[in-house]
């Protein structure tokens, strides 16, 4: 149970990182590496090492802080780049929205396996990086079903 909770925390941190990349021109190759590696680590049977997952969460936070360093000292925090609490997804009362967001998330995790292995082999596609970011943001946003479907 602890590992699953850490994986949820990592996923929430990745959604926060994705939020920080939207409209930001400072995202680097390292930013995308952290995002893809983090998503890959949340796949079933990839990592049961709690210490490694905690380190991945810290790496995601460092990457986010590099993109939006002013968020740490903001006098009027807006929460825009905060980590997402995945319990909001699991406890979503609308089962259709919960199911659609879960489908998006699990699909992203599966895609991350391919993207991770491509990354290890030296291949990268900026459009794929952006897609990961935009799709993670959708999981963390509160939309009615009709609007969520339009945004996919």
Task: Give the residues covered by each predicted segment.
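Metallocofactor- and cofactor-centric catalytic cores in central/energy metabolism, strongly enriched
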Residues: 1-152
């Amino acid at each position: 149970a602890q590992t699953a909770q850490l994986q949820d925390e990592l996923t929430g941190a990745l959604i926060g990182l994705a939020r920080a990349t939207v409209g930001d021109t400072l995202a680097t190759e390292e930013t995308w590496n952290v995002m893809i590696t983090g998503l890959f680590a949340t796949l079933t049977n990839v990592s049961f090492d709690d210490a490694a997952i905690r380190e991945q969460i810290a790496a995601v936070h460092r990457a986010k802080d590099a993109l939006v360093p002013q968020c740490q000292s903001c006098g009027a925090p807006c929460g825009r780049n905060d980590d997402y609490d995945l319990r909001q997804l699991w406890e979503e009362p609308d089962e259709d929205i919960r199911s659609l967001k879960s489908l998006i998330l699990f699909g992203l995790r599966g895609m991350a396996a391919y993207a991770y292995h491509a990354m290890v082999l030296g291949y990268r596609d900026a459009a794929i990086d952006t897609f990961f970011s935009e799709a993670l943001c959708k999981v963390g946003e509160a939309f009615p079903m009709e609007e969520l479907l339009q945004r996919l």
